[in-house]
Amino acid sequence: MTNIRKSHPLIKIINNSFIDLPAPSNISAWWNFGSLLGICLGLQILTGLFLAMHYTSDTATAFSSVTHICRDVNYGWVLRYLHANGASMFFICLYLHVGRGLYYGSYLFKETWNMGVILLFAVMATAFMGYVLPWGQMSFWGATVITNLLSAIPYIGTDLVEWIWGGFSVDKATLTRFFAFHFLLPFIISALVMVHLLFLHETGSNNPTGIPSNMDMIPFHPYYTIKDILGLFMMILVLLSLVLFSPDMLGDPDNYMPANPLSTPPHIKPEWYFLFAYAILRSIPNKLGGVLALVLSILILVIIPFLHTSKQRSMTFRPLSQCLFWLLTADLLTLTWIGGQPVEHPYVIIGQLASILYFLIIIVIMPLTSLMENHLLKW
């Protein structure tokens, strides 16, 4: 009799994806983040489902329903903070996952990479809408400022914004639809993840050397399941430390004040994981230009496979490209810091320089350096 995991039509798919999947024998801990992201998504859907049972998406009661969850629901505060800080862990894993792809040349699997970029946009949209739901000051003003950016689109902008708002300002209709979409999108993301994995399993995983590893593969289970569980424990340790010791560390104190359309907070800013894009948006003193730069800061990932000029896939043996990669990382951290600062000297000029450097490294310096390294190989 054949083993059921190899013959059953449903279990067979799981077996070929997570158990008998041939994986390169030398992939490092940087390959852990895919599974961690899957776990983050599951955690967010689960905690979100229980939160949705107690939340009301009405401007009059949204803020107090969140307070009710934290005070009166059994372990409601754990659910709320797991969900809020789980989003932060999600983005940490996402950015490290993308960074790994950039460093080791995984972007040359174009279908998988482009699917990943679509996933990144979907997760960002979901997180933005989720931030609006507690209906605090930063929720309301963040929603107003970010949705208002669409009015920069020529001709249809104003109509588009009012259509999204469901009125002439961010109000009850906006909150209700944001809740509906925030609930729906994670399930769409789950479907997109399946497609992402489908594309990945067509080609197989990349590895740190960037050299094809078809002749040296090992089964995913038990080797990488154990390795992934270690990564999972480390992530849970960080997440629980955040939730149980300083749950509000990554949040904004202004969001503990109920939304008031008549009082603007002194400094409107999004959650920390959007600050780098927000800094790029603010660095251009033109509304449409800023919006374009904001979208391009993420969309630029799509053209990266076409900017690959090196003869080697990975950066493992390319010291000059490595320096540029870490310069880009430092630049993104600088942008994240600037995004949280007020719009005044010297932050404005630092933000502008960091924004220019960001696009310059990706579009110009990196491809030229790769060409130079190709010539150095001939010596």
Swiss-Prot record:
- Identify the residues that bind heme b b562: H83, H182
List all membrane-crossing ranges. Answer: 33-53, 77-98, 113-133, 178-198, 226-246, 288-308, 320-340, 347-367
Positions that bind heme b b566 = H97, H196
What molecular functions are annotated in GO for this chain? metal ion binding; ubiquinol-cytochrome-c reductase activity
Cofactor(s) the record lists:
heme b
Cysteines paired by S-S bonds: none
Compartmental location: Mitochondrion inner membrane
Which SUPFAM superfamilies does the entry mention?
a domain/subunit of cytochrome bc1 complex (Ubiquinol-cytochrome c reductase) (SSF81648), Transmembrane di-heme cytochromes (SSF81342)
Manner of cofactor binding, per the entry note: Binds 2 heme b groups non-covalently.
**Membrane topology of the entry:** Multi-pass membrane protein
Keywords of the record, alphabetical order, are: Electron transport, Heme, Iron, Membrane, Metal-binding, Mitochondrion, Mitochondrion inner membrane, Respiratory chain, Transmembrane, Transmembrane helix, Transport, Ubiquinone
Cellular-component GO terms for this entry:
mitochondrial inner membrane; respiratory chain complex III
Q: Which GO terms describe its biological process?
A: mitochondrial electron transport, ubiquinol to cytochrome c
Family matches, as InterPro entries: Cyt_b/b6_C, Cyt_b/b6_C_sf, Cyt_b/b6_N, Cytb/b6-like_sf, Cytochrome_b, Cytochrome_b_C_euk/bac, Cytochrome_b_N_euk/bac, Di-haem_cyt_TM
Q: What positions does the entry give for a ubiquinone binding? A: H201
Checking Pfam families in the record gives: Cytochrom_B_C, Cytochrome_B
Extra information: Heme 1 (or BL or b562) is low-potential and absorbs at about 562 nm, and heme 2 (or BH or b566) is high-potential and absorbs at about 566 nm.
Q: How does it associate, per the subunit comment?
A: The cytochrome bc1 complex contains 11 subunits: 3 respiratory subunits (MT-CYB, CYC1 and UQCRFS1), 2 core proteins (UQCRC1 and UQCRC2) and 6 low-molecular weight proteins (UQCRH/QCR6, UQCRB/QCR7, UQCRQ/QCR8, UQCR10/QCR9, UQCR11/QCR10 and a cleavage product of UQCRFS1). This cytochrome bc1 complex then forms a dimer.
What family does this belong to? Belongs to the cytochrome b family.
Function text: Component of the ubiquinol-cytochrome c reductase complex (complex III or cytochrome b-c1 complex) that is part of the mitochondrial respiratory chain. The b-c1 complex mediates electron transfer from ubiquinol to cytochrome c. Contributes to the generation of a proton gradient across the mitochondrial membrane that is then used for ATP synthesis.
Q: What is this protein called?
A: Cytochrome b
Q: Which organism is it from?
A: Pipistrellus pipistrellus
Please name the gene that encodes this protein. Answer: MT-CYB
